[in-house]
């Protein structure tokens, strides 16, 4: 028996890393289209939060490692968040200016056991729509609670996932801390009967009025999972034709590794939960992992696909068991939006219970979220239809890239080009400089051709080698701008974006030190290479404004605008400050 468990564990661990199976999309699979992203779902137009819940979610938590420590009171709130607690929750969502949530539609129980939850959610969806909140339906792609499913839907017995003649069960969270959930049998999406079974559940969600379908537990064989997404999109198109409603969007938890990410070409939306710590300064270490990963994800996806990014671990612990501080909540939101994503957040467990019961720790965190969401809603133009202004690209093969961390901490304006997806993200010819780290794998013929074309078009390629120091300055010199100088730098970094017409630039400044504001920061922003000298010979005809969710009227002094340089001093950056430079209309 012990040997069998060990074998099952090793196979389950393999499936946890199913991104090790490279995915190559085949021509017959559905391709998502930008016109199917409705205006409210475009990047910068939404504030998203997960609202996992219902009796079926409480049952699931009891049978999985992340929910085993929930108290009876936490499980009670979770069970009733879609019925007796929902009106209070709706008020909280409105208070915090959320306009997009997801709900637990189906997570692996039988049709019969999920029926009450579906009926509750029909009312939830209607109430959300009445209040301007859009709703995604969460479904599990591979999970079966076998006692329930096998009893009520006996055909599911035929759909189990096997490997080396061993039945596979849900396991996690990591290979080194592997806990097998024996109640959660995994299904094989390659089997048409299983996909048809899931599509019946997804179609019921569309009939209930949801705006999107979100697939989780994308575990197993890539060809079957991709076919499930394809089937979902075909169903969504059919329902749109039949009802006249907009087509529901589709997205899935594919994860960040580039070998499998191309599956997202089938989806309109990108949702990822690859954050492993909260942004900040921890024991003297300046953590910019999330900003780096968001840049990597932006290099993997289509430019038009909205991106939602979530931490499955916070600095205080697992997301279900702790509540990050107000300062951490604020910086997480600001970081995501500054770098072109939206924050996703799982409040299931400790946080949800604290909100419903009015606990001060939860209320303070929620108030911080509401404060920043209001700023985002009132200043959508800072995040909607914007693009990075960088002229430096950094080539990365994997999400982890120490050079990216160095560039971020030095406020080098750059974007990530992902080696396996050079056709995605910002086009390579938009950049002047491409920095290549030393540890890249061997290039394919297609990759070589793209890089050669970049160089032939006047692009500068810098091989970083092992000599990291000095690379940033070389890249900035070769790019010729833009460039940012902060004095004192402290733990502040900057990101520069712009409107597509080039007449508005947006400088995002984030202070990663939760304990102390950055004070009297001298800012020098050079926009060489970006301001069109034929239209505005210098910045003297540009308006400069400073905004912050932390202060009604942020103070700045010593404004000097000349040629392509803007200089000023910010008296205080508590967590997040935005500076806009806008060209005045010609007289």
Over which residues does each language-model region extend?
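The substrate-binding groove and active-site-proximal loops of carbohydrate-active enzymes
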Residues: 47-82, 103-118, 179-196, 218-226, ...
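Hydrophobic faces of well-ordered beta-strands that scaffold small-molecule active sites
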Residues: 47-54, 101-103, 135-137, 213-215, ...
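Bacterial Sec-dependent signal peptides at the C-terminal "C-region" and cleavage site
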Residues: 12-25
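Catalytic domains of carbohydrate-active enzymes, especially glycoside hydrolases
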Residues: 78-107, 204-211, 332-343, 410
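Aromatic-lined substrate-binding rim segments of carbohydrate-active enzymes
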Residues: 89-90, 103-143, 224-235
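Carbohydrate-binding surfaces of carbohydrate-active enzymes
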Residues: 26, 199, 226-247, 255-257, ...
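Acidic (Asp/Glu)-rich catalytic clusters
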Residues: 89-97, 123-131, 261-264, 291-301
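Active-site-adjacent "subsite" loops/lids of carbohydrate-active enzymes
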Residues: 64-83, 121, 137-208
């Amino acid at each position: 028996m012990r040997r069998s468990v060990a074998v099952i564990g090793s196979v389950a661990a393999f499936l946890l890393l199913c991104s090790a199976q490279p995915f190559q999309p085949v021509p017959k699979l559905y391709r998502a289209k930008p016109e199917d992203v409705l205006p409210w779902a475009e990047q910068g137009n939404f504030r998203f939060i997960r609202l996992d819940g219902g009796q079926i979610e409480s049952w699931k938590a009891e049978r999985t490692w992340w929910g085993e420590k929930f108290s009876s009171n936490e499980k009670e709130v979770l069970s009733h968040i879609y019925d007796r607690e929902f009106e209070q929750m709706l008020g909280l969502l409105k208070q915090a200016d959320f306009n997009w949530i997801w709900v637990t539609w189906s997570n692996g129980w039988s049709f019969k056991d999920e029926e009450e939850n579906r009926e509750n959610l029909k009312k939830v969806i209607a109430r959300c729509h009445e209040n301007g909140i859009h709703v995604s339906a969460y479904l599990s792609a591979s999970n079966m609670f076998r006692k329930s499913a096998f009893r009520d839907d006996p055909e599911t017995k035929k759909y189990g996932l096997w490997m080396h003649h061993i039945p596979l069960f849900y396991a996690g969270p990591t290979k080194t801390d592997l806990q097998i959930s024996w109640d959660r049998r995994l299904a094989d999406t390659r089997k048409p009967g299983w996909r048809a079974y899931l599509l019946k559940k997804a179609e019921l969600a569309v009939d209930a009025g949801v705006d999107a379908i979100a697939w989780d537990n994308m575990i197993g064989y890539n060809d079957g999972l991709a076919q499930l997404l394809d089937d979902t999109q075909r169903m969504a198109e059919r329902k749109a034709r039949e009802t006249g409603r907009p087509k529901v969007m589709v997205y899935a938890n594919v994860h960040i590794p580039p070998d499998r990410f191309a599956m997202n070409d089938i989806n309109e939306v990108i949702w990822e939960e690859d954050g492993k710590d909260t942004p900040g300064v921890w024991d003297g270490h300046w953590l910019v992992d999330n900003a780096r990963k968001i840049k990597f994800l932006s290099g993997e996806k289509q430019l038009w696909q909205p991106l939602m990014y979530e931490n499955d671990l916070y600095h205080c612990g697992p997301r279900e068991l702790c509540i990050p501080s107000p300062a951490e909540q604020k910086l997480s939101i600001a970081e995501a939006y500054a770098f072109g994503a939206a924050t996703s957040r799982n409040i299931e467990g400790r946080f949800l219970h604290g909100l419903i019961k009015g606990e001060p720790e939860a209320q303070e965190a929620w108030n911080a979220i509401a404060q920043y969401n209001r700023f985002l809603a009132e200043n959508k133009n800072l995040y909607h239809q914007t693009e990075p202004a960088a002229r430096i690209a950094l080539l990365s093969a994997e999400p982890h890239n120490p050079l990216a961390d160095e560039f971020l901490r030095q406020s080098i304006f750059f974007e990530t080009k992902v080696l396996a997806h050079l056709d995605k993200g910002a086009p390579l010819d938009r950049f002047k400089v491409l920095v290549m780290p030393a540890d890249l794998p061997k290039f394919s013929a297609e990759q070589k051709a793209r890089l050669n074309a970049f160089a032939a078009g006047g692009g500068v390629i810098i091989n970083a080698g092992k000599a990291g120091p000095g690379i940033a300055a070389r890249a900035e010199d070769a790019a010729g701008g833009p460039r940012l100088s902060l004095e004192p730098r402290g733990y502040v970094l900057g990101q520069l974006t712009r409107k597509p017409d080039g007449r508005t630039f947006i400088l995002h400044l984030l202070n990663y030190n939760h304990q102390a504001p950055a004070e009297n920061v001298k800012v020098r922003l050079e926009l060489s290479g970006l301001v069109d000298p034929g239209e505005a010979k210098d910045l003297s005809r540009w308006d400069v404004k400073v905004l912050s969710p932390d202060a009604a009227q942020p103070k700045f002094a010593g404004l000097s605008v000349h040629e392509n340089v803007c200089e000023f001093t910010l008296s205080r950056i508590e967590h997040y400050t935005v500076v806009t430079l806008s060209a005045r209309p010609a007289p």
